[in-house]
């Protein structure tokens, strides 16, 4: 397994402390990797800053060609990437290969095209004898911090728009799941000029802090927890860096009496538990109107009970393990606290799976109240709660009564209601009669403590640029 860092076009061993990388399906150590030292972090940032002088002036065509080459290489090595992701994250191998790899390739290809469509406003005379134009230019060095739930996917979401816009990047994957990013480093080093992409390994305190606080870094992009986002925003405040934050969610799933119950059950069974629920848009907070509440709980409970947890390399496995032992304990604690309320009923699941690995049973909890922690706090595991509601006004207020604002869905056959409720929901994305669907052309990003800034789409590309005014006297 490739375990070296990419700094200034060269693969080098880390000079810091060694950290174990685990297989969450077994709990075994896969390998130990040395972190980047403080000197290596500085070298990576300075390499990116030096490379920006040329890369920032390349044509969109040149940048697009590099991104397309990288997409092709990822596609050609799709099985290798899927196997690494499966071993390091515990994802079912078939899901990593069939779902994630094609989407990752598409992200790079989309931004290759988008790079050639980015432009400022046409020139105009707004002062006599002067012509003004608006430019969208790259910022410089971008420090990107990727999470452990979708390591390669999130690396793609961060690298592709930043590079397409003409920035240079220093990427730090999670120390829990670094293997696909380090493999990407090996393949990318011969495609991009030295210093344009740099990939490090290490913990937040030892590598993340010196990276995000470096004076040469002009933007920090994070996908992670609210706590990590708060830390980075505070840590970078003195240097006035631009920040791009995607900080989790607790998606409300609003099911009205007239909804297609079978479609809801099928949707939540898939979208509430995909990736073992380790997804910030997971369909995890159901509000069911009282007329269909009992039926939905019964049918959904039966469906969730059929989800199969198992070995990642088993084609029939639907849920793999959680990412780490620490996270398994967090999820278990959240469910135990829900049980302790006395009014929340475990319909199915509610316990760790016996045996090796960090497995938690797919869990459905009914009877949750609006103020319960299981409704208000992100669990980030295979745990879905159901809360009954009376009417539209009540459920919209409840859905918006959350610190999160990333994703939501509305299930109804009433087109007017779908439009009306969607317009009032305080979430970056609202799906109607589906959930979880993402495409490269549409933006993904949140409100409130879920953060700000957009991934994917032309809006995502613009986030990695600075608007500049140039005026010429004539």
Swiss-Prot record:
Keywords: NAD, Oxidoreductase. The keyword Lipid metabolism does not apply. The keyword Transmembrane does not apply. Induction: Up-regulated under nitrogen starvation conditions. One of its GO terms (biological process) is protein homotetramerization. Pathway: Amine and polyamine degradation; putrescine degradation; 4-aminobutanoate from 4-aminobutanal: step 1/1; Amino-acid degradation. It comes from the Bacteria. Disruption phenotype: Cells lacking this gene show a high decrease in gamma-aminobutyraldehyde dehydrogenase activity, but are still able to grow with putrescine as the sole nitrogen source. However, a mutant lacking both patD and puuC cannot grow with putrescine as the sole nitrogen source. GO terms for molecular function: aldehyde dehydrogenase (NAD+) activity; aminobutyraldehyde dehydrogenase (NAD+) activity; identical protein binding; NAD binding. It catalyses: 4-aminobutanal + NAD(+) + H2O = 4-aminobutanoate + NADH + 2 H(+); 5-aminopentanal + NAD(+) + H2O = 5-aminopentanoate + NADH + 2 H(+). It holds the Pfam family Aldedh. Can be used in the industrial production of the value-added compound 5-aminovalerate. Optimum pH is 5.4. GO terms for cellular component: cytosol; protein-containing complex. NAD(+) binds at residues 146-148, 172-175, 209, 225-228, 280. Gene3D superfamilies: Aldehyde Dehydrogenase, Chain A, domain 1 (3.40.605.10), Aldehyde Dehydrogenase, Chain A, domain 2 (3.40.309.10). Its EC number is 1.2.1.19, 1.2.1.-. The active site is at residues 246, 280. It is an enzyme of class 1 (oxidoreductase). Homotetramer. Belongs to the aldehyde dehydrogenase family. Gamma-aminobutyraldehyde dehydrogenase subfamily. 4-aminobutanal can spontaneously cyclize to 1-pyrroline, and 5-aminopentanal to 1-piperideine. HAMAP family: Aldedh_Prr. This is Gamma-aminobutyraldehyde dehydrogenase. The gene is patD.
């Amino acid at each position: 397994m490739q375990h070296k860092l990419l700094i200034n076009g060269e693969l080098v061993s880390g000079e810091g402390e060694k950290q174990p990388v685990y297989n969450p399906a077994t709990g075994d150590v896969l390998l130990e990797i040395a972190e980047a030292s403080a000197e290596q972090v500085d070298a990576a940032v300075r390499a990116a800053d030096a490379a920006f002088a040329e890369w920032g002036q390349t044509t969109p065509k040149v940048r697009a060609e590099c991104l397309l080459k990288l997409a092709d290489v990822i596609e050609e090595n799709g099985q290798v990437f899927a196997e690494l992701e499966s071993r390091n994250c515990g994802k079912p191998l078939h899901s990593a290969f069939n779902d994630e790899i094609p989407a990752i390739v598409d992200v790079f290809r989309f931004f290759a095209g988008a790079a050639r469509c980015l432009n400022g406003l046409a020139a105009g005379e707004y002062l006599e004898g002067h012509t003004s134009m608006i430019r969208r230019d790259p910022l410089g060095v971008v420090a990107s911090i990727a999470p452990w739930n979708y390591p390669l996917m999130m690396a793609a979401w961060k690298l592709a728009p930043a590079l397409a816009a003409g920035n240079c990047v220093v990427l730090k994957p999670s120390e829990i799941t670094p293997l696909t990013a380090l493999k990407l480093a090996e393949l990318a080093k011969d495609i991009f000029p030295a210093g344009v992409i740099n990939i490090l390994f290490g913990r937040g305190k030892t590598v993340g802090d010196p990276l995000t606080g470096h004076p040469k870094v002009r933007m920090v992009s994070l996908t992670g927890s609210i706590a990590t986002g708060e830390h980075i925003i505070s840590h970078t405040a003195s240097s006035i860096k631009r920040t791009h934050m995607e900080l989790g969610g607790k998606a409300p799933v609003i099911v009205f009496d007239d909804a297609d119950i079978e479609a809801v059950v099928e949707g939540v069974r898939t979208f509430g538990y995909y990736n073992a629920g380790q997804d910030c848009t997971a369909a995890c907070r159901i509000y069911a109107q009282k007329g269909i509440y009992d039926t939905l709980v019964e049918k959904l409970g039966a469906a969730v009970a059929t989800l199969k947890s198992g070995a990642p390399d088993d084609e029939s496995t639907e849920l793999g393990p959680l990412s780490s032992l620490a996270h398994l304990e967090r999820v278990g604690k959240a469910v135990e606290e829900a049980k302790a309320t006395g009014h929340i009923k475990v319909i199915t699941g509610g316990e760790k799976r016996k045996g090796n690995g960090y497995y938690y049973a797919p869990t459905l909890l009914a009877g949750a109240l609006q103020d319960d922690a299981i409704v208000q706090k992100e669990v980030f595991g295979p745990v879905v709660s159901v809360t009954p509601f009376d009417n539209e006004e009540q459920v919209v207020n409840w859905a918006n009564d959350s610190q999160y604002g990333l994703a939501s869905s509305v299930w109804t056959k009433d087109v007017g209601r779908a439009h009306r409720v969607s317009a009032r929901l305080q979430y970056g994305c609202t799906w109607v009669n589906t959930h979880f669907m993402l495409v490269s052309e549409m933006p993904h990003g949140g409100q409130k403590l879920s953060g700000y800034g957009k991934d994917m789409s032309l809006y995502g590309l613009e986030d990695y640029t600075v608007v500049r005014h140039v005026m010429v006297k004539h």
